[in-house]
Amino acid sequence: MTGTALTGMMIVAAGLFAAGVFGVLARRGILFQLISLEVALSGPALAFIAAGAYHGDAEGQGMFVLVLTLAAAEVAVGLALFLRIRRSKGSDDSDAVSGLKG
């Protein structure tokens, strides 16, 4: 892999991360926030793969497996919380959930 290809892959990875973070901050629905979080996690995963391919070692692939495992755990916990919130509040709006009791 050349330096130009690595630069292009890093730009795409940064774009994915930025789009995911924007989606988490801009959307109100919890399900859309979970999807945006997955997009945000795919950015660093792509960066690990590209850097590993550029340097010719397998550490990037190992980090990708770690990010993939983290994303799978995040989806499992996030969907369980989403279903619980949807049943108790009747809405998937994150503003409805964030009300403090006191």
From Swiss-Prot:
Reactions that this protein is recorded to catalyse: a quinone + NADH + 5 H(+)(in) = a quinol + NAD(+) + 4 H(+)(out)
Main location class: membrane
Any Pfam family matching the protein: Oxidored_q2
EC number of this enzyme: 7.1.1.-
Keyword hit for Cell membrane: yes
Gene Ontology cellular component list: NADH dehydrogenase complex; plasma membrane
GO biological process: ATP synthesis coupled electron transport
Membrane protein topology class: Multi-pass membrane protein
Compartments it resides in: Cell inner membrane
Enzyme class: translocase
Membrane-spanning segments: 5-25, 30-50, 63-83
GO molecular function: NADH:ubiquinone reductase (non-electrogenic) activity; quinone binding
Self-association and partners: NDH-1 is composed of 14 different subunits. Subunits NuoA, H, J, K, L, M, N constitute the membrane sector of the complex.
PANTHER family per the UniProt record, alphabetical: NADH-UBIQUINONE OXIDOREDUCTASE CHAIN 4L, NADH-UBIQUINONE OXIDOREDUCTASE SUBUNIT ND4L
Function: NDH-1 shuttles electrons from NADH, via FMN and iron-sulfur (Fe-S) centers, to quinones in the respiratory chain. The immediate electron acceptor for the enzyme in this species is believed to be ubiquinone. Couples the redox reaction to proton translocation (for every two electrons transferred, four hydrogen ions are translocated across the cytoplasmic membrane), and thus conserves the redox energy in a proton gradient.
Annotated family: Belongs to the complex I subunit 4L family.
Protein name: NADH-quinone oxidoreductase subunit K
Species: Rhodopseudomonas palustris (strain BisB18)
